[in-house]
From Swiss-Prot:
Residue ranges of the TM segments: 11-31, 52-72, 158-178, 185-205
Protein's gene: hrcR
Keywords: Cell membrane, Hypersensitive response elicitation, Membrane, Transmembrane, Transmembrane helix
Main location: membrane
InterPro entries per the UniProt record, alphabetical: T3SS_IM_P (IPR005838), T3SS_YscR-like (IPR005773)
Family designation: Belongs to the FliP/MopC/SpaP family.
GO biological process, one term: protein secretion
Protein name as it appears in the record: Harpin secretion protein HrcR
Source organism superkingdom: Bacteria
Pfam families xref list: FliP (PF00813)
Entry annotated with the keyword Kinase: no
Function: Required for the secretion of harpin.
Cell compartments where the protein resides: Cell membrane
Amino acid sequence: MSTEQFDPMTFALFLGALSLIPILMIVCTCFLKISMVLLITRNAIGVQQVPPNMALYGIALAATLFVMAPVFNQMQQQFSQAPADMSNMDNLKTSITNGVAPLQKFMTHNTDPDILIHLQENSVKMWPKPMSDDVSKDNLLLVIPAFVLSELQAGFKIGFLIYIPFIVIDLIVSNVLLTLGMQMVTPMTLSLPLKMLLLILINGWTRLLDGLFYSCL
């Protein structure tokens, strides 16, 4: 590729944008929600380091790639049909906008409309007049933070529902030990294996991941 085919400054900005891919992988996919739910589940069980953080993030990444595979495939097809044009900034912006359209559609579908409207109202108050006048609900500057907030909210909702049966087990074990006069026995000593047994009997991890998969569709 000769230097006549692209603008050096545009190419440099494009390379710089590639360094943001790990961050975008977190905030623009279902990775955030899946990792949150897995960490909350581990805390609800009561084991702080099993599985370790690295393993949980690996599971979350694998699950994210599984869920996002159709979206990434559509993006790959978009870029194959219309490769990034780095001749100038406007052409590059148009190419990227067209390429990330499937990802934007995914984020919009999984975004709470109320949160998106709230951020749009905030943009009118906080952004300069010319900029706020041109903003729409399809603007990535609104869609991305609205999607992140929606994923956080959904993750905590799922985590709360997961916590309930484990809290019930803790309360039952504590009351039984108190009734038997075994105050010296730590409730966690008995509740932990019961929680693990519950997960095994109901095939908990598979059901949890299935639920997360379908919640991201």
